[in-house]
Amino acid sequence: MTTYATDSQGKFIPSTQRPDGTWRKPRRVRDGYVPQEEVPLYESKGKLFAQKPLLPPGMSPEMAQKSREKREREQRIKQQREADANRRPPQNPVPGLLILNGDSKINQPQQRAAKSAKPKKKAVELPDVLLEQKQKEEQKQVRQQQQQQKSQKDHKNTKPHHQERIEEVAKAMNGLQLTNNHVASASAADALQTDLSKKLRKLRKKIREIEIIEERLRSTDGGPRPDKDQIDKAKRKPEILKEIEELEKGIAK
């Protein structure tokens, strides 16, 4: 355990001598610092519970042993009384008549009468119940057959009407499909005309740019000369004029 000394500035660890004879410097201790070896070890709840005494405070092991033996003895006596009560012979049906535990001949007629009485009651009630269930099932089957026959007749009567409705719907769908095809073809033609017009405008714009380049080539006022890309663009003038002519024919159609 670390020993501390105290001065006017607080606690500190005094200097100690090493095994080689040299001395360590004294070290100042911060307030509230606890060395690692003095930190209490963590113990789980199970370990703490196991360390607690099993007996109540002030109770000796001998007293606990006597109390446990007394409780076990009382429990055995209680079980013995219950077993004796279960083995107790039945009450005498006739006053003055003694019935022993091993003699069961006297009780046999009564037991046979009780056993035979119960099945007779069931034999009387069971057929009636089965008969009622069978009648209910037959009535249910008859009702189901009648409902099936009625539904089949209704289906036969309504079949022509449904057929007419189906044919009307099919005709309407065919007419709608033709209308949609016509609208689609018209919209496609309009889109094609729009694309041709846009392309024609772009080509005409290129022709105007080429004409400007040609004017710069013909001019002698000493202005800036066209570069190589502009000259190559001017050489494509015949091709562009041919494309414009073809597009104009396509738009005219």
UniProtKB/Swiss-Prot annotation:
Signal peptide bounds: none
Coiled coil: 129-156, 189-221
GO BP annotations, alphabetical order: exon-exon junction complex disassembly; nuclear-transcribed mRNA catabolic process, nonsense-mediated decay
Region (Disordered): 1-168, 218-237
Main location (coarse class): cytoplasm
Residue ranges with Basic and acidic residues bias: 65-87, 131-141, 151-168
Biased composition regions of type Polar residues, renumbered to the chain: 1-19
InterPro entries: PYM1, WIBG_mago-bd, WIBG_N_sf
MF terms (GO), sorted A to Z: RNA binding
Keyword field: Coiled coil, Cytoplasm, Nucleus
Protein's cellular compartments: Cytoplasm; Nucleus
Superkingdom of the source species: Eukaryota
Cellular component, GO, one term: exon-exon junction complex
Function noted in UniProt: Regulator of the exon junction complex (EJC), a multiprotein complex that associates immediately upstream of the exon-exon junction on mRNAs and serves as a positional landmarks for the intron exon structure of genes and directs post-transcriptional processes in the cytoplasm such as mRNA export, nonsense-mediated mRNA decay (NMD) or translation.
PANTHER family assigned to the protein according to its UniProt record, in alphabetical order: PARTNER OF Y14 AND MAGO, PYM PROTEIN
Subunit structure, as described in the record: Interacts (via N-terminus) with mago and tsu/Y14; the interaction is direct.
Family affiliation: Belongs to the pym family.
Listed name of the protein: Partner of Y14 and mago
Name of the coding gene: Pym
